[in-house]
Amino acid sequence: MNVRDYLTADEIAGLTRRSDLRAAWIVLCQWLQVAALFAAMGIWPHPLTIVPGILLLGGRQLGFGILVHECGHRTLFRSQRFNDLVGDWLAAAPTFNNMRAYIRGHLVHHRKAGTTEDPDLPNYRDYPISRERLARKLKRDFTGQTGMRTLRGLGRAIAGLPSLSEEARAAVVRGIVVNLALLGLFTALGAAWLYLVWVVAYVFVQPAISRIRQVSEHAAVPDLLDPDPRRNTRTIRANYLWRGLFSPHDINFHLEHHLMASVPIYHLRRMHRLLAERGAYDGIDFPDNHLDLLRRVTHGPAGPAPA
């Protein structure tokens, strides 16, 4: 599919135009939502605030990952300098992410999507899978097995800091600085325990949310090996609640992102509407939410299968 068959040159120029104001607002809202969750738990420390707070923080941690994705593509802000600065410090560092390492692999995924050379293919090639198999995967996530592997890897990176590459070392140092700043802030406010909540969300919730987000984008699509993104990638028409948890910052419009990766996230919704109005999506059945998605990527009981 060629988007130029459906969009004018002026529309494409508008869709790919960056806005520093909108980008700054998205980053600010991301941090304000995190702050609001911590404030609610700190002011009213009760299971009725802490348990939902941990779940929502897992979604916000994915939100930081989406900002890393956008800054890595150089599409959030107009200047490369701002994309790098915000991506490194305000998006990647809170979860010890390495934006440059991430985007190198991600760009290969964009070039090779729809082929057997897609580096992300093993993550969703087997779908649809049985509900029992998906439940086992999510059980590993929610019991911390997946997150603890990540945490152990981070521990090894910190212990071996001098031996890391300059790029990797800088990413780890930024993560240490930002996380120590969070711990220091909570300690100064007399609520150091809130940092533990951040870690718990990272270990026990964020892996499951990230898995569902990844499944939503490419699993059980019409044809993983078709070069047309309409066949190998999916968009979900989800409401605010579903998007906030599993597809923050409009990343649920993933088909549009694969059709034209130069479009910032704050224009993807408009791009989807334009293409839908002009028949580009005729015959495509978009899931209404992530529960609908999970029904589509799973099937009934099956025999023994790999985890």
Regions found by a protein language model. Name each.
Residues G58-V68, R100, L138, Q145-T150, ...:
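Transmembrane alpha-helical segments that form the membrane-embedded catalytic/substrate-channel core
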Residues L37, G72, L76-F77, L225, ...:
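Active-site-flanking alpha-helical
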